[in-house]
Amino acid sequence: MDLPPQLSFALYVSAFALGFPLNLLAIRGAVSHAKLRLTPSLVYTLHLACSDLLLAITLPLKAVEALASGVWPLPLPFCPVFALAHFAPLYAGGGFLAALSAGRYLGAAFPFGYQAIRRPCYSWGVCVAIWALVLCHLGLALGLEAPRGWVDNTTSSLGINIPVNGSPVCLEAWDPDSARPARLSFSILLFFLPLVITAFCYVGCLRALVHSGLSHKRKLRAAWVAGGALLTLLLCLGPYNASNVASFINPDLEGSWRKLGLITGAWSVVLNPLVTGYLGTGPGQGTICVTRTPRGTIQK
């Protein structure tokens, strides 16, 4: 299913128009909370919001590229820079969502033990590790891409593919023999593993909610916050990573499904700020998960 270029353009522009201000608000809200008390959830939220902000900044260029049917509109050296700026947040977001979910689950399942060891410095270390893993993986994939001009009558280097007498294409014409294994490894390590962690933690938070003493309204809100990360992974990042797996198994499925997956991935910049819960400015409006202990109900 090929989306019309005008529709792809409109979807990218809409994601930018909504996601850019939402993530600015999320950063502002998280910073205001951090001034009162810095917590691991705030650290993950700040990194996620900054990651989404970087992704949102690349969306206007992606929209222009879609309107031009994939033709790269900038000078060729900007292609690898764009690749890192666009795809690093796309993959890193799953790691930050999994880290947020793990923190909520540990706070619910082991409230007092987790309270004793939860330190923002540990969360900063996790975030640095996620960024390093993503950037090294992407950098290695781009660096190993070899020029194939003598083989397939094209000029290819660092993500740019230029058919002879044709227009430059960034990444989307990447040699399939290199692209499919690389994209599959990205998806397994940076999406499906975080997805499993997030799903496990979501079930743990739901079990804690069942035994909590909160009102029905607050239980619903807590369930939404706990399930928001899983929802974002499935709805926004799921289609793109599923297309990577499908195209590895059956190369005929590549192309239009990948383009659709990139569009849904772009909309994660809209959904993430809504589910992390830091758009408000008042204290205590952030992400929560609850549990009942012998000393009362604890919120995370």
From Swiss-Prot:
Entry GO CC: plasma membrane
Topological domain spans for side Extracellular: 1-8, 65-79, 143-178, 249-256
Record key words, sorted: Cell membrane, Disulfide bond, G-protein coupled receptor, Glycoprotein, Lipid-binding, Membrane, Receptor, Transducer, Transmembrane, Transmembrane helix
Glycan-bearing residues: 153
Keyword Membrane included in the entry's annotation: yes
Keyword field contains Cell membrane: yes
Name of this chain's protein: Free fatty acid receptor 1
